[in-house]
Amino acid sequence: PTDVAALTYNKRDCLTVASAMGIPTAKRYRLNQGETISLDAIENKVGFPCFVKANRAGSSFGVYKVYDKKELQPAIEKAFEEDHQLLIESALEGREITVGVLEWKNDVHVLPITEIISENDFFDYQAKYEGKSTEITPAQLPAEWEASAKKMAKQLYIQMGLKGISRSEFIFQDGVPHLLEINTIPGMTLQSIIPQQ
């Protein structure tokens, strides 16, 4: 379980493993501190808008939404203050959901889906912890969207060897859920999503 937690905490590695399992994800670019930064290469790979993310940070720390090339370098510099590894992803536009999965009595159960509607530009720290978002449980989704998201969340849980409770976050693009990240240590406060599910 420790190595699984480390894998899911490392956004880049987790998404690489998920992609190999056939789970759709955003286009992404890896960048390490000290490497030559090619703004053109980043733009060509992920386009704009995009997200610059500290690779190993939680609660949306070190995450910046970038709309054009002139904003990219400052966002990279800020994100490097959080981690020396970055993940730069194309910004997916669509409905955002989170799916809880848990193992109970030797059976894997998928919890009701929660849709996240952020008042901010994305589900950032303020939206998560300062009430700047609305969570709708159960999410009002077309049946086929719900089925595909639940299937993917369960597949990730089983094939990655997750234990306890996990929360997989997706954004729908053209009716297809794209994985954003997996949280294997989800919050359990009254404001947290898993207790609502």
Segments from the language model and where they lie:
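Short, acidic/turn-prone active-site loops that include or flank metal/cofactor-
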Residues: 2-5, 116-117
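Residue-level marker of alpha-helix boundaries and capping positions
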Residues: 4-5, 66, 144, 185
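Active-site nucleotide/adenylate-binding loops and adjacent lid/helix of ATP-dependent enzymes
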Residues: 6-95, 150
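Short glycine-/small-residue-rich flexible loop motifs, especially phosphate/cofactor-binding loops
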Residues: 15, 40, 154, 180, ...
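Glycine-rich phosphate/pyrophosphate-binding beta-alpha loops
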Residues: 60, 116-119, 183-196
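Phosphate-binding site of ATP-dependent enzymes
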Residues: 67-151, 172-178
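Conserved metal-phosphate-binding beta-hairpin within the catalytic cores
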Residues: 90, 100, 157-189
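Active-site anion/phosphate-binding pocket segments in diverse small-molecule metabolic enzymes
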Residues: 112-114, 152-163
